[in-house]
Amino acid sequence: MTYSLNTLNSDAAHHATRGLARYAQELGLLFGLIGLVFWGLALASYNLTDPAWTTSGNGSPTRNWGGGIGAFLADGSYALLGLSVWLCWAAGMRSWMAALARWMRGGVPEAGEPSPRLRRLSFWSGLVLLVVAGTALEWSRLYRLEGLLPGNAGGALGYVVGPFAQKWLGFNGAGLLCIALMVPVSYTHLTLPTNRE
């Protein structure tokens, strides 16, 4: 008589996701990966001469690897958040990998893992703080990169938050606060280490 792996060690209170919910989870993982790869390719191949949201282009063919849709997506992303949009892309990849790990475990939470509500709240609040601090820092320190972007360095969010921080904290104070927010927030809120041995 044979048993599948971990059958005798399974907890009766936690059952793996089955049926339609499992199928929806798999489709979500597949479409999430496709979307993240497309967004990453569109951002990586951004060109200022492509016709998009902030520009009509110069009449040449679209050079973005995502075509016209990719040009619009990359242009809008860079216009809104500047180069800090890559923080959102990296957080999206990390979130996708965490969802993949949950799917591979069958949807059964590990012992010591925080509740889904706490995990989501911590992740999203950390990401918002990280992006706000990143765009403000980009606006105040990396303004030489404006020639590569469709708008201001730090995008529209950096254009709003950066001057506010610099007005109230000064040039050095705003930079120190943004760095002080970015380093611990990116570690504590976006990683959430679990009790693994």
Model-flagged regions — what are they?
Residues 1-190:
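Alpha-helical transmembrane segments used as membrane anchors
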Residues 189, 195-197:
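Single conserved hydrophobic/aromatic residue that forms the stacking wall/gate
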